Structure formats: structure tokens, C-alpha cells
From Swiss-Prot:
Xref: PANTHER family: FI18310P1-RELATED (PTHR24276:SF98), POLYSERASE-RELATED (PTHR24276)
Record-annotated disulphide pairs: 56-72, 183-195, 205-236
Similarity field: Belongs to the peptidase S1 family.
Residues modified by glycosylation: 108
Pfam families named in the record: Trypsin
Annotated signal peptide: 1-21
Domain Peptidase S1: 29-260
GO biological process terms on file: proteolysis
Name of this chain's protein: Glucanase inhibitor protein 3
Keyword field contains Secreted: yes
Length: 261
């Protein structure tokens, strides 16, 4: 949910899905509302400059590490390259709040497949520790996720489709997680992805990727769990058509191996 970039705007043919639709990277917030200022401060925006527009999302998972999608770090010709992250900010750009930290390295998941978006995960290492608390990671066995559990996706993307403008303030929308079999049957994804959404008019959509999909446990932001990162979908806000997210639990072993180095 942020500014549309050439990386995020790329349209990719979806041969595995039996629908006539664009396989597009996400996201945008349809049918949601503003996140209260000063909350969900583990949410991260990727930027090319400290004050520039956010073009991809992520989540702080340790004081010095951000989890995002590998598609956000792809150094393709004409694409935006992240050099900075904005942590804890409510706004699309600027230095009004939060903190701006330099990225010193980016490591994509070893099994990342750019054609299918399997294992679409990347860990960014920061130059210095963030002052904000990181979000909790899910259990490796996937037990934090089950069919129809409510989740929340957040970001700065456009709030109307197809001609909307990016939101200057952090937005969120609540979506339900699909069961694995239903997700695979609908969109042909593997176990490194999960589906959420499918309620008409409420979705993440065309734009940047990497925005966090979280589960709230009713005990405040410190107890939120990172379930996924916004990836791709077919259409926007269509009934019975979910969006696809990178499943964080599928990469836990790899994530831990990177952040503990």
C-alpha cells in the first residue's frame, strides 16, 4: 500500500489460475480505515531516500531486521531500489514521525521463485537498531493460522481502484484467512503462500508489496503476530477472490538463520 512503482506495476500472466484476470502485485487498501497514529509501529515502509515516498512495505522483526518480500528487493531495470526504511511512521513520506534507518544488506529466501512468487521473503539488515518494538513471528508449525481467522493488512496504498491515489496515512482493513486447500484450489499456490480476503470491496490491491498481514490477539500491539506479507492477486476487492500473501511461518527456519548471524 504505497506509491505505485514500476516494479509493483508489472503484470505477470497467471497460468495456474483458471480465471481471466491480471496476476498483479499488491497492494492497496479497499474498504478500510486509518490506523491510529502511534500504533502498529512495527510497520515499515521501504524508501529510496529517508524522506521519499514509501513504495513497498515490511515489518520490523528484530531491532536490526525487517522482513519484506523478495519482489521488493529485486534490482530490475527501472525499478525502485530500497536504501532506507521508515519504521514506526504513520505517513507515506517525510520525517514527521517514526525513524528513518539505512539498509546495509538484503537477503532473499534461498527458495524464492520470481515467476511463481514462492517463498517471496527477504530480510533487510539495518545500519543501527530501531527504537521501536518488533512484531512477534508466528510458530513454525503454522498453528497461528487457521481457516476463517480474522486478520488485518496495513499499508499506504490507494484506497480506490483502478484510478485511486496513494494514502498519505497508514490504512488497514480486516480480512479472513482461507484454508490451505481452498486457497490452493482457487489460485494454485503452494504452501509458502496463504490466501485472505474475498469479501466484496475489502482487499489489498494493485501497487507495492510487502505490507504486513497480522493477527491481533486482543492484548495490544505487543502481542500481534505477523502472519504474512502482501503479495499478489487477481482483480481487486472481488467477492470470493482472495489476495495472496507470503506465508511467514513457511520461512521461519530461514528467517532465524539470517537474523541470528
Amino acid at each position: 500500500m504505497k506509491v505505485l512503482s514500476s516494479l509493483a506495476a508489472a503484470l505477470i500472466a497467471l497460468s495456474a489460475v483458471d480465471v481471466e484476470a491480471e496476476h498483479v502485485q499488491r497492494s492497496l487498501i479497499l474498504g478500510g480505515g486509518k490506523v491510529p497514529v502511534g500504533s502498529k509501529t512495527y510497520t515499515v515502509g521501504l524508501r529510496t531516500t529517508p524522506e521519499g515516498d514509501t513504495f513497498c512495505g515490511g515489518a520490523l522483526i528484530s531491532p536490526t531486521h525487517v522482513l519484506t518480500t523478495a519482489s521488493c528487493t529485486a534490482y530490475e531495470e527501472g525499478s525502485s531500489i530500497p536504501h532506507w526504511v521508515a519504521v514506526g511512521t504513520h505517513y507515506l513520506n517525510g520525517k514527521k514521525d517514526g525513524e528513518q534507518l539505512k539498509i546495509v544488506s538484503a537477503q532473499n529466501h534461498t527458495l524464492y521463485d520470481a515467476s511463481s512468487f514462492s517463498y517471496n521473503l527477504a530480510v533487510l539488515t539495518l545500519e543501527k537498531p530501531s527504537k521501536f518494538a518488533p512484531i512477534k513471528l508466528p510458530k513454525a508449525d503454522g498453528s497461528d493460522i487457521f481457516p476463517r481467522v480474522w486478520s488485518k493488512v496495513m499499508g499506504w496504498g490507494v484506497t480506490s481502484y483502478p484510478n485511486g491515489k496513494p494514502s498519505n496515512e497508514l490504512q488497514s482493513v480486516d480480512v479472513r484467512v482461507w484454508g490451505d486447500n481452498a486457497c490452493e484450489n482457487k489460485l494454485g499456490v503452494d504452501k509458502s503462500s496463504l490466501c485472505a480476503g474475498g469479501e466484496a470491496g475489502k482487499d489489498s490491491c494493485v501497487g507495492d508489496t510487502g505490507d504486513p498481514l497480522i493477527k491481533e490477539n486482543g492484548r495490544g500491539d505487543a502481542d500481534d503476530i505477523l502472519l504474512g506479507l502482501s503479495g499478489w492477486g487477481t482483480g481487486c476487492g472481488d467477492k470470493d477472490m482472495p489476495s495472496v500473501y507470503s506465508r511467514v511461518s513457511a520461512g521461519i527456519e530461514w528467517i532465524n538463520s539470517v537474523i541470528k548471524k
